[in-house]
């Protein structure tokens, strides 16, 4: 195991960089403890890789810097970055299989983007109504 590992996770326009190192079980998001994250459902989503890790989470510290996007995109990017960093730090194939079985999207960046608006419409697919015919 090296001193620290840096991994990146992306979702929509959000980019999260997770730094994992030996420690005492502290998990910071942009310098604040993860327990202070205001949206509970997103906080639980970000804690999933740590919950899968179990008792071994007490021997590491994870510091995540995330920017861009909105709340959900940032939460998904954070979750992906943390899961990738945990797998590389512990180098445990059983742990990777467990995370992959729980949710494959924790290890794969979601590349979907918003479809651009088209001319003569209100959005990507919606069109203005025609009053004739």
Curated annotation (Swiss-Prot):
It holds the Pfam family Ribosomal_S9. GO terms for biological process: maturation of SSU-rRNA from tricistronic rRNA transcript (SSU-rRNA, 5.8S rRNA, LSU-rRNA); translation. The keyword DNA repair does not apply. Gene3D superfamilies: 3.30.230.10. One of its GO terms (molecular function) is structural constituent of ribosome. InterPro entries: Ribosomal_Su5_D2-typ_SF (IPR020568), Ribosomal_uS9 (IPR000754), Ribosomal_uS9_archaeal (IPR019958), Ribosomal_uS9_CS (IPR020574), Ribsml_uS5_D2-typ_fold_subgr (IPR014721). GO terms for cellular component: cytosolic small ribosomal subunit. Keywords: Ribonucleoprotein, Ribosomal protein. The keyword Ribonucleoprotein applies. PANTHER family: RIBOSOMAL PROTEIN S16 (PTHR21569:SF16), RIBOSOMAL PROTEIN S9 (PTHR21569). Belongs to the universal ribosomal protein uS9 family. This is Small ribosomal subunit protein uS9.
């Amino acid at each position: 195991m090296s001193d620290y590992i840096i991994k990146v996770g992306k979702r929509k326009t959000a980019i999260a960089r997770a730094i994992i190192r030996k420690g005492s079980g502290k998990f910071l998001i942009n310098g604040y403890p993860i327990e202070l994250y205001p949206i509970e459902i997103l906080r639980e989503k970000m804690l999933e890789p740590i919950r899968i890790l179990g008792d071994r989470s007490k021997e590491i510290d994870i510091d995540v810097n995330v920017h861009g996007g909105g709340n959900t995109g940032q939460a998904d990017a954070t979750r992906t970055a943390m899961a990738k960093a945990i797998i590389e730090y512990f180098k445990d194939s059983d742990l990777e299989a467990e995370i992959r079985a729980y949710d494959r999207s924790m290890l794969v960046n979601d590349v979907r983007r918003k479809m651009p608006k088209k001319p003569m419409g209100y959005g990507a697919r919606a069109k203005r109504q025609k009053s004739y015919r």
